[in-house]
């Protein structure tokens, strides 16, 4: 199976690798995994007082498609509102990265991770 140039670019030069303090009230963290393949994805967002995602980072243990999906999503959410980030769908990730059918689960993980990070952020703001 050959990866697309975009997958290879994000895999070889991942953007936004790292982590924020999970105790920061402006940080939302999402941790998701796929037991079938062993991929684990942690994605975090940092939201400003206007509800705009000003930064994002990730740490992913998995294949090139999982790393590329994480990297791409952290780029996409920067500068977006929470609502805009929530609307990101795995199908858009698949199209952008030209993922083969056997790697679609990686895009689902990325969508689930951003939604989990947003849920965590919202939970912190309510409490």
Curated annotation (Swiss-Prot):
Q: Which Gene3D superfamilies does this UniProt record tie to the protein?
A: 3.90.1010.10
Q: Which GO terms describe its biological process?
A: iron-sulfur cluster assembly
Q: Cite the GO molecular-function annotations of the record.
A: iron ion binding; iron-sulfur cluster binding
Q: Which GO terms describe its cellular component?
A: cytoplasm
**Subunit (UniProt):** Forms a heterotetramer with IscS; each subunit of the IscS dimer contacts an IscU monomer.
| Function text | A scaffold on which IscS assembles Fe-S clusters. Subsequently gives the nascent cluster to other proteins. It is likely that Fe-S cluster coordination is flexible as the role of this complex is to build and then hand off Fe-S clusters.
Q: Which family does it belong to?
A: Belongs to the NifU family.
Protein name listed in UniProt: Iron-sulfur cluster assembly scaffold protein IscU
């Amino acid at each position: 199976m050959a990866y697309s140039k975009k997958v290879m670019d994000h895999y070889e030069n991942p953007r936004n690798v790292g982590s924020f303090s999970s105790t920061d009230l402006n940080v939302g963290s999402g941790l998701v995994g796929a037991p079938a393949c062993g991929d684990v994805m942690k994605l975090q967002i940092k939201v400003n007082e206007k509800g705009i995602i000003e930064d994002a980072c990730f740490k992913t243990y998995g294949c090139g498609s999982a790393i590329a999906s994480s990297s791409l999503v952290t780029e996409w959410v920067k500068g977006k509102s929470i609502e805009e980030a929530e609307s990101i769908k795995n199908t858009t990730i698949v199209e952008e990265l030209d993922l083969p059918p056997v790697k679609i689960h990686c895009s689902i993980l990325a969508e689930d991770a951003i939604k989990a990070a947003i849920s965590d952020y919202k939970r912190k703001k309510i409490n």
